[in-house]
């Protein structure tokens, strides 16, 4: 099917649709009993990511259950440092961990074999495009260089990413080298996903919000702009969503300077400001995931507010970050029905 039949691709081209198409970040996840069952079969989390049979299954589960307008490849933003031999591991109750990198380690990093290492993920993309309904958009993704770098520097997640911020101040040249290497490798990875069958891709910058104004320009905007320019120079028709969580008022500059086709919004972005951003192009978001957990009027009012402010322009309805394990699957059903006008 051409892009004209896939609603999300139409919005990414600037079209306004009513009702808007929707998908949810982390829609394949622990809130679904069928996901938990497949996760138990797979073994480790990375085994789940790297085994196409399992990764395809968990990607398709929310499509079967809810009929979302997009399926997003089941993987993780940290597969790139894993491919760079940083010993990435996911421990229950601790989140992702890896061997922290220092200045010397950055100098010896090699990104040449990353895409080859991630062939199982690309096989998952190929199989998904074959198995998905023709009208369903297939989204690939990767992490933004800043967010991936924060984990590589600290070796784990931290509340405000202070280790990476400090490293960037003390070792500016090495840190810039790391960001640009990640930008180039990530662009190669996105091109490979597009070639394998992804209709569009999303860049996740989950920790953009901890950066000051100058650092946001240097660490969030510049590397992502480099990525997007690289992808589009090779695949001019590629559609790219960029999600810089916590970027706030800097999102207007972020859109202009990165060249993203659509901007993802977290739930803290005021809807009046979101409507201003929408005048420059498509937006995606931005329901608070806690409203999905709460259900009832909290869920209904959150949905209605977004549709009232953004529903007449190019909008992909989504959450402002990933759905949480505490979400009731029935609340997600109510969300889908209400966005589509059935509630």
UniProtKB/Swiss-Prot annotation:
GO terms for biological process: protoporphyrinogen IX biosynthetic process from glutamate. The record marks 76 as: Transition state stabilizer. It catalyses: uroporphyrinogen III + 4 H(+) = coproporphyrinogen III + 4 CO2. GO terms for cellular component: cytosol. InterPro entries: UROD/MetE-like_sf, Uroporphyrinogen_deCO2ase_HemE, Uroporphyrinogen_deCOase. Pathway: Porphyrin-containing compound metabolism; protoporphyrin-IX biosynthesis; coproporphyrinogen-III from 5-aminolevulinate: step 4/4. It is found in: Cytoplasm. It is an enzyme of class 4 (lyase). Substrate binds at residues 26-30, 76, 151, 206, 321. The keyword Cytoplasm applies. Pfam families: URO-D (PF01208). Gene3D superfamilies: 3.20.20.210. HAMAP family: URO_D. Homodimer. Belongs to the uroporphyrinogen decarboxylase family. PANTHER family: METHYLTETRAHYDROFOLATE:HOMOCYSTEINE METHYLTRANSFERASE RELATED, UROPORPHYRINOGEN DECARBOXYLASE. This is Uroporphyrinogen decarboxylase. It comes from Rhizobium johnstonii (strain DSM 114642 / LMG 32736 / 3841). The gene is hemE.
């Amino acid at each position: 099917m051409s892009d004209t039949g896939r609603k999300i691709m139409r919005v990414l081209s600037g079209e306004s649709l009513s009702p808007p198409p929707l998908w949810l970040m982390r829609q394949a996840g622990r809130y679904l009993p069928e996901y938990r069952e497949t996760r138990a079969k797979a073994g480790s989390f990375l085994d789940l990511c790297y085994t196409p049979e399992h990764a395809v299954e968990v990607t398709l589960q929310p499509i079967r259950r809810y009929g979302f307008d997009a399926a997003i490849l089941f993987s993780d933003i940290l597969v790139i440092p894993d491919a760079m031999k940083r010993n990435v591991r996911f421990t229950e109750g601790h989140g992702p961990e890896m061997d922290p990198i220092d200045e010397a380690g950055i100098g010896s990093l090699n990104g040449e074999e990353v895409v080859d290492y991630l062939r199982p993920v690309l096989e998952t993309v190929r199989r998904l495009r074959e198995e998905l309904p023709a009208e369903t958009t297939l989204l690939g993704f990767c992490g933004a260089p800043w967010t991936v770098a924060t984990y590589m520097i600290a070796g784990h997640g931290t509340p405000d990413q202070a280790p990476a911020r400090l490293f960037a101040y003390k070792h500016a040249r090495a840190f810039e080298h790391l960001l640009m290497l990640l930008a180039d490798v990530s662009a190669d990875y996105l091109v490979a996903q597009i070639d394998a069958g992804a209709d569009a891709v999303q860049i996740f910058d989950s920790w953009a919000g901890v950066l000051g104004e100058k650092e946001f320009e240097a660490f969030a905007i510049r590397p992502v702009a480099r990525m997007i320019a690289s992808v589009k120079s090779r695949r001019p028709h590629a559609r790219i969503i960029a999600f810089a969580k916590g970027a706030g008022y800097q999102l207007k500059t972020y859109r202009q300077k990165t060249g993203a086709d659509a901007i993802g919004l977290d739930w803290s972005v005021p809807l009046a400001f979101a409507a201003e951003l929408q005048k420059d192009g498509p937006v995606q978001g931005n329901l608070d995931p806690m409203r999905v957990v709460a259900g009832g009027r909290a869920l209904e009012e959150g949905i209605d507010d977004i549709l009232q402010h953004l529903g007449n322009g190019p909008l992909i309805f989504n959450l402002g970050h990933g759905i949480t394990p505490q979400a009731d699957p029935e609340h997600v059903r109510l969300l889908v029905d209400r966005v589509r006008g059935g509630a």
